[in-house]
Amino acid sequence: MTPQLNNLTLPIYMDYQATTPIDPRVMEAMLPYFTTKFGNPHSRSHSFGWEAENAVEEARSMVAKLIGADTKEIIFTSGATESNNLAIKGIAKFYSNKKNHIITVVSEHKCVLDACRHLEQEGIKITYLPIKPNGIIDLETLKNAITDQTMLVSVMVVNNEIGVVQPLKEIGKICREKGVFFHSDIAQGFGKIPIDVNAFNIDLASISGHKIYGPKGIGALYVRKKPRVRITPLINGGGQERGMRSGTLPTPLIVGLGMAAEIAYSEMEKDTKHVNYLFDRFLNNIHKRISEVYLNGDKNQRYKGNLNLSFAGVEGESMILAIKDLAVSSGSACTSASLEPSYVLRSIGIGEELAHTAIRFGIGRFTTEQEVDYAVNLICSKIDKLRALSPLWEMMQEGIDLKKIKWAVH
């Protein structure tokens, strides 16, 4: 049984960057397409197919509207990982006879970095841009990295680990002036912050359903039509999705993504106010009660549903065990199985000791003030206890610089 505490259900979900709970309105919209409206949207000879096709196209227009795109520019995929692979590898394969250079950032999602490493093995040159200590890229460094061989720049809008928001409008302007395609993994920002593909000069954008209170297993890739962007498909078959992504479309999941996008479009301002208020309440109350807690990533240029905090003198893994009533993460869900410190935190210059103490707290649409207050109280009480047991904390209080210690190897 799930324990109850003063009408509070435990454990409290605070891992909104890993996934979001499905909005009940999304589930309600999806259900008929599992049961009575089960037609194949590619069946053109009867009403079951027409009904499913209409639902798919309505969802497509909802997704497009949220980023200021044309309906025909939305290609449905299985999620942001596939979309990122399709965008990066698809551009590389189509244009490799003309250009052979791609630029990305050291702090991108693992699937972007891995797609780029795969292309390196095929002879494509990849530049991995560094980021500043606040997590933001330097625009001059980007400008200087672009050559006449550069075909694509790939920069995510909101970092999944530290929540910083990259200056997409400025990046897009540079790319357009230099005649380079601009791809952005917008999975963590879609439906949460305003994104306009035309104002930002974005040519390709990757979208995920389960990051915006929609179902898992569905995503989309925005592919610009004017000026036209061409990509080589990764999956061959029946030629669905304008030939870019073959396979029968999963109508229920697409309807869910569409409804999630529609809700985000109408409620983004309300969600933002709610999340910002809880972010400030969480962070201010933590800082009032315990010392040497650091917010990773820029405080202002960030999506405030993400609080990545380092607690000096406390191991992140032991902290997670101590606060088991909170569902949190010590890294991205894709890489946190590793005990290595986060590559994103290392890329902003955080030392190994502090990187190991980092925990990511996620705040979302369904997080309550009561949950935040409970989380703060629990964290503060456990931090005090863990620090009292920690020889590292004791050494820090005595002014010993842990970086200068030479540890014995056994």
Curated annotation (Swiss-Prot):
The active site is at residue 334. GO terms for biological process: [2Fe-2S] cluster assembly. One of its GO terms (molecular function) is 2 iron, 2 sulfur cluster binding. Transmembrane segments: none annotated. Pyridoxal 5'-phosphate binds at residues 80-81, 160, 188, 208-210, 248. Pfam families: Aminotran_5. InterPro entries: Aminotrans_V_dom, Aminotrans_V_PyrdxlP_BS, Cys_deSase_IscS, Cysteine_dSase, PyrdxlP-dep_Trfase, PyrdxlP-dep_Trfase_major, PyrdxlP-dep_Trfase_small. SUPFAM superfamilies: PLP-dependent transferases. Its EC number is 2.8.1.7. The modification N6-(pyridoxal phosphate)lysine is found at residue 211. Keywords: 2Fe-2S, Cytoplasm, Iron, Iron-sulfur, Metal-binding, Pyridoxal phosphate, Transferase. It is found in: Cytoplasm. [2Fe-2S] cluster binds at residue 334. Its main location: cytoplasm. It catalyses: (sulfur carrier)-H + L-cysteine = (sulfur carrier)-SH + L-alanine. Pathway: Cofactor biosynthesis; iron-sulfur cluster biosynthesis. Its cofactor is pyridoxal 5'-phosphate. GO terms for cellular component: L-cysteine desulfurase complex. It comes from the Bacteria. NCBIfam families: IscS, PRK02948.1, PRK14012.1. Homodimer. Forms a heterotetramer with IscU, interacts with other sulfur acceptors. PANTHER family: CYSTEINE DESULFURASE, CYSTEINE DESULFURYLASE FAMILY MEMBER. Master enzyme that delivers sulfur to a number of partners involved in Fe-S cluster assembly, tRNA modification or cofactor biosynthesis. Catalyzes the removal of elemental sulfur atoms from cysteine to produce alanine. Functions as a sulfur delivery protein for Fe-S cluster synthesis onto IscU, an Fe-S scaffold assembly protein, as well as other S acceptor proteins. Belongs to the class-V pyridoxal-phosphate-dependent aminotransferase family. NifS/IscS subfamily. This is Cysteine desulfurase IscS.
